[in-house]
């Protein structure tokens, strides 16, 4: 227990099958964040971004996995809430290359007073990181941000495409909880 994937209401807005050479077949970016863990018997909970203002939303989360490859934040305030959670000891894994065409949709992150190429740049800047941090693990306050520069769809679509993802998730979980992840083929 303690693994969650961040979802936003905008998740279903990005359902165009192929645009400018970018595709996310069969909801793969979402499944890429959940199925690799579930196949190892790890229950994964969903956290709705729009529920972040409620204090209890992240109370039991040890590792929060997110990507803007398949959704976008509707409001900038959610980023400060995520950063505050990390600074207080939370562990956030961000997966993505930030290259899908929806990054350029006219929205708050690329309108005045901002000029970000993707909403993740705003998140990382609030965390005190470079706007486009390289893949790696970063200490932010008492917590950690792990950046995986790969779209999560590849964790579901490619054979062994989830190896690095699972290594990062399980390693970060052990680091923040002090517990080893128990892998199994069931949820009991």
Residue map of PLM features:
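Carbohydrate-binding surface patches
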Residues: 2-22, 26-31, 67, 72, ...
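Generic, well-ordered alpha-helical scaffold segments in large soluble proteins
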Residues: 36, 40, 67, 85-88
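An acidic- and aromatic-residue-enriched active-site/binding cleft used to recognize and process polar
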Residues: 8, 49, 68-69, 97-99
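A conserved amphipathic helix/loop scaffold
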Residues: 56, 72-188
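Short, well-ordered secondary-structure micro-motifs within conserved domains or adaptor modules
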Residues: 58-70
